[in-house]
Amino acid sequence: MWLEESQMKSKGALHPRRIPWVCAVVSISFLSACFISTCVVTHYFLLWKRGSALKFSDYHTRLTCILEEPQPGATGGTWTCCPVSWRAFQSNCYFALNDNQTWHESERNCSGMSSHLVTINTEAEQDFVTQLLDEQFSYFLGLSYEKVEGQWQWVDKTPFNPNVVFWKVGEPKDSMEEDCVVLVYDQDKWVWNDFPCHFEMGRICKLPGATFDWNPSK
C-alpha cells in the first residue's frame, strides 16, 4: 500500500524527490572510503559502474579493488579489481595455494576458479609472484614441455619467450619425465626447475583483473 505525502512526512519517511540525493550521498561516501584504502565491492557494483559484463564468472561474487599509482601529473588513475583474497599486479590477479596436487590437477583447480596456472612474462612479474610464496613449498607454473612441438609452452597459449626465464643453474635437464615447471626456493632466491608432472606441488593461479579508469575531474 502506498503512503500519501502527508503520511510520509508524519512518519519521517523520505520524500521521493529526496531519494536521488540520498543515493548520491551514499555513493560519494562509498567512493571516498575506497579512495582512502583498498575497496571491497560486489560484482554487481562493478556491473553498474562499468555498464558492461565483467570477465569474472559468478564464482567470484566479491572483489577487492585497488587504485594503481597514477603517473606524475595525472589527475586520475586506474582501478584494478580482483576476487577477494587474490592479489593484483599490472591488471592481473594472482592466488597461491600450498596444498599439493599434480600439475594437471592444479590446472583443473585453477580452471574451476576461472583462471589458469600462472604465466610469468617479465622479471617484475617474477618478483611480484614470489612475494606471495612460502619458502617451505614449491609451486607449479603454467609451463610445460610439449614433445610434439618440441618446445616449452604456457598453458594459456601465451607465447613463450626463451629470453625471459629464471631457471635454476643447470636446468632444465631435458629429462624424459620432467615436462612441467615449478618455482623452488634455492640458495636464497626463487628459480624455475623442471619436474615430473605427476609430482604433487603447490600452485599459483592467475586471471585477468577487471579494470576501469577513475578521473575526479569528470
Swiss-Prot record:
Residues that span the membrane, as ranges: 25-47
Pfam families: Lectin_C
Topological domains annotated Extracellular: 48-218
Any single biological process term in GO: defense response to bacterium
Chain ranges of the C-type lectin domain: 89-206
Role played: Calcium-dependent lectin that acts as a pattern recognition receptor (PRR) of the innate immune system: recognizes damage-associated molecular patterns (DAMPs) of pathogen-associated molecular patterns (PAMPs) of bacteria and fungi. The PAMPs include alpha-mannans on C.albicans hypheas and mycobacterial trehalose 6,6'-dimycolate (TDM). Interacts with signaling adapter Fc receptor gamma chain/FCER1G, likely via CLEC4E, to form a functional complex in myeloid cells.
Protein name, as recorded: C-type lectin domain family 4 member D
Organism: Rattus norvegicus
Lineage summary: Eukaryota, Metazoa, Chordata, Craniata, Vertebrata
